[in-house]
C-alpha cells in the first residue's frame, strides 16, 4: 500500500506543471527569434523601441519596464506576444 501511494505521489509530481512560467521573445532588433521562460510570477512580456545613432532599436523581454519619454513600449500578457 505504501509503495502504491509513493508511486502515485511521484507520478503526480512529474506529470503536473507545478510552476507555470510565461514565455517571451527576447531577441534584440533584427536578430534571429529566441525565447526565454520568465521568472515565476512574471506574467507579461514587453517590446521596447527607440531610435539612436545606430537607427531603430528593439528590445524584447519579460516584464513591463518603466521607460523614458520618447521610447515606445508595448506590454502584453500571452505566450510569445511581444514580437
From Swiss-Prot:
Expression by tissue: Expressed by the venom gland.
GO cellular component, one term: extracellular region
Record InterPro entries: Snake_3FTx, Snake_toxin-like_sf, Snake_toxin_con_site, Toxin_cobra-type
MF-aspect GO terms: acetylcholine receptor inhibitor activity; ion channel regulator activity; toxin activity
Keywords from the UniProt entry: Acetylcholine receptor inhibiting toxin, Disulfide bond, Ion channel impairing toxin, Neurotoxin, Postsynaptic neurotoxin, Secreted, Signal, Toxin
Signal peptide boundaries: 1-21
Coiled coil: none
Signal among keywords: yes
Main localization, broad class: secreted
Protein location: Secreted
Family named by the database record: Belongs to the three-finger toxin family. Short-chain subfamily. Type I alpha-neurotoxin sub-subfamily.
Protein name: Short neurotoxin NCA-04
Organism per entry: Laticauda colubrina (Yellow-lipped sea krait)
Amino acid at each position: 500500500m505504501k509503495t502504491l501511494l509513493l508511486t502515485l505521489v511521484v507520478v503526480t509530481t512529474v506529470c503536473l506543471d507545478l510552476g507555470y512560467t510565461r514565455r517571451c521573445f527576447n531577441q534584440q532588433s533584427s536578430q534571429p527569434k529566441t525565447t526565454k521562460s520568465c521568472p515565476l510570477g512574471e506574467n507579461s512580456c514587453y517590446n521596447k523601441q527607440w531610435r539612436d545613432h545606430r537607427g531603430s532599436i528593439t528590445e524584447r523581454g519579460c516584464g513591463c519596464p518603466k521607460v523614458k519619454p520618447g521610447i515606445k513600449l508595448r506590454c502584453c500578457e500571452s505566450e510569445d506576444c511581444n514580437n
